[in-house]
């Protein structure tokens, strides 16, 4: 199947690669089929979730654990059943990223992660009831915190040998 997209031009997609969001993504309820487009630059942790029904609709997504390793939330039994999750290893978590002109203001929506069963290609955007996670987590700030924590726990920071 050929899909004409705004951001990637004409791409060929395999029906088996289509990820189905039965409930859509909030705000985009009419779009239930997406393709994961991996960034060809392996050094860059941002990818795309391209709508199949609308070539102009694509979300920038990333793995939240890359910048927020302690990210933690529960997946309800209802969602486990709806996505037919049999094993946690079949689950992939992403967050939608907002990329403004000033890259320092780039944010990730940690309050509403995307969970995808990679085995059967079913997905859902969760809405977490959390005071800890927000819709706009500044990614570069989170990375900076990780680096500071890493520097504090390194042997050199603890007075270890070089």
Curated annotation (Swiss-Prot):
InterPro entries: Flagellar_assembly_factor_FliW, Flagellar_assmbl_FliW_dom_sf
Subcellular location: Cytoplasm
GO biological process, one term: regulation of translation
One Pfam family named in its UniProt record: FliW
Keywords associated with the record: Bacterial flagellum biogenesis, Chaperone, Cytoplasm, Translation regulation
GO cellular component, one term: cytoplasm
Alphabetized Gene3D superfamilies for the sequence: BH3618-like (2.30.290.10)
Recorded family membership: Belongs to the FliW family.
Biological role: Acts as an anti-CsrA protein, binds CsrA and prevents it from repressing translation of its target genes, one of which is flagellin. Binds to flagellin and participates in the assembly of the flagellum.
Annotated PANTHER family: FLAGELLAR ASSEMBLY FACTOR FLIW (PTHR39190:SF1)
Oligomeric and partner information: Interacts with translational regulator CsrA and flagellin(s).
Protein name: Flagellar assembly factor FliW
Originating organism: Alkaliphilus metalliredigens (strain QYMF)
